[in-house]
Swiss-Prot record:
GO terms for cellular component: plasma membrane-derived thylakoid membrane; proton-transporting ATP synthase complex
Keyword Transmembrane helix in record: yes
One example GO MF annotation: proton-transporting ATP synthase activity, rotational mechanism
Name of the molecule in the record: ATP synthase subunit a 2
Alphabetized UniProt keyword annotations: ATP synthesis, CF(0), Hydrogen ion transport, Ion transport, Membrane, Plasmid, Thylakoid, Transmembrane, Transmembrane helix, Transport
The keyword Ion transport belongs to this UniProt entry's keyword annotation: yes
Taxon lineage: Bacteria, Bacillati, Cyanobacteriota, Cyanophyceae, Acaryochloridales
Length: 234
């Protein structure tokens, strides 16, 4: 039994190899592209909408509401990035119902890449919200001696984000393999249902943690935020 999709090699030439992580990552992206085109090709602003558009609106509005609850600010600037993370991870895990499929989130390289996306998104959103000087000043809080610790804290959060998702998905794969060897007829059905639920939960937690990190970097004084809002609406 392969613990990670990196161990499943389909083709290798010298130092270059084509493993299950790459194959199934492209599969997930392909499903997302085709699914997005299929659902959005006939979008309508009327009250009579298709089931696909209705499902899409439920997902988008649900993600936006969750972001809104976390940051207590307009969620639209963060919705594309956080929504993409959630949908990609959730779909990667949900496709596990397909025989032979191995979730790319079970590879440390995939979870590290996702965590790096969050790592670079944090300062981008922070600078956009607070400016370069305002963003860099937070590393000197509460006093300049905390600078190295604040920097280490940023790196440690990203490492924890990558390892946490990888560990949960890999451990799920190991448990399924053990139960299949013990009772191959009864436990697979239960584990499939539990695996689907766990996959969505892991995607939700990853997206929430990413949003928390971004919100911490782009947090502005609430009084200033309210004043700016009043000026823009006044």
């Amino acid at each position: 039994m392969h613990l990670t999709p990196d161990q499943t090699i389909f083709w290798q030439w010298g130092l270059f190899s084509l493993n299950a992580t790459l194959i199934f990552t492209w599969l997930v992206m392909g499903v997302l592209v085709v699914g997005s085109w299929f659902v959005t090709r006939h979008l309508s602003a009327s009250t009579q909408i298709s089931r696909g558009q209705n499902l899409l609106e439920v997902i988008v509005l649900g993600i936006r509401d969750q972001i809104q609850e976390i940051i207590d600010q307009p969620a639209d600037p963060y919705l594309p990035f956080i929504g993409t993370l959630f949908i990609f991870i959730a779909l990667s895990n949900l496709l596990s119902v397909i025989p032979g499929y191995q979730p790319p989130t079970g590879s440390l390289s995939t979870t590290t890449a996702l965590a790096l996306c969050v790592f670079f998104a944090v300062p981008l959103y922070g600078v956009q919200k607070k400016g370069v000087r305002g963003y860099l000043q937070q590393y000197l809080q509460p006093n300049p001696i905390m600078l190295p610790f604040n920097i280490i804290g940023d790196f440690s959060r990203i490492v924890a984000l990558a390892v946490r998702l990888f560990g949960n998905v890999m451990s799920g794969t190991m448990i399924v393999g053990i139960l299949l060897s013990v009772a191959p007829l009864f436990f697979p059905v239960m584990m499939q249902v539990l695996g689907l639920l766990t996959g969505v939960i892991q995607a939700y937690i990853f997206a929430i943690l990413a949003m928390v990190f971004i919100a911490a970097a782009s947090q502005v004084d609430q009084h200033n935020y309210q004043t700016d809002s009043e000026v823009s609406h006044g």
